[in-house]
Amino acid sequence: MTLVKIGLWGGNGGSAQDISVPPKKLLGVTIYSSDAIRSIAFNYIGVDGQEYAIGPWGGGEGTSTEIKLGSSEHIKEISGTHGPVYDLADIVTYLKIVTSANNTYEAGVPNGKEFSIPLQDSGHVVGFFGRSGTLIDAIGIYVHP
């Protein structure tokens, strides 16, 4: 099974965040946001068949956006913005996630430079990596094409 790492979008602040076991299927995502993306956590099934709970990366509280994917549902598109917020030069300010069941989830406030990752045909997001401190500085995705 091929795995592709795409990104990062955002700034260079914070610490690098990544997973150690390659992902096979994304189960769910929880995002906390306000004027920016404050934290992200997710669950996935690894290529070893085990379930992993990752994060939260970032910190702080805010509005919770919970995405629980059905057994045959997957994320087919992620877009968002990144730019200056508070006294930080470049962080992820907004995320929009669309699933194969045409469910759309939004978190944060659109502000800054736009990015979009529409996936072709059967491609789907199976995990995340990025940079975080007290907020999400940058985000990238793992994709099964």
Swiss-Prot record:
Region of interest called 2 X approximate repeats, Gly-rich, as start-end residue ranges on this chain: 6-64
InterPro entries, per the entry = Jacalin-like_lectin_dom, Jacalin-like_lectin_dom_plant, Jacalin-like_lectin_dom_sf
* Boundaries of every Jacalin-type lectin domain copy: 3-145
Q: Which UniProt keywords apply?
A: Lectin, Repeat
Regulation: induction: In response to salt and related osmotic stresses.
What SMART domains has UniProt attached to this entry? Jacalin
* Pfam families linked to this entry: Jacalin (PF01419)
**Is Protein biosynthesis one of the keywords?**
no
Which GO molecular-function terms appear in the entry?
Answer: carbohydrate binding
Give the sequence repeat ranges: 6-15, 54-64
Can you name this protein? Salt stress-induced protein
Q: Which organism is it from?
A: Oryza sativa subsp. indica
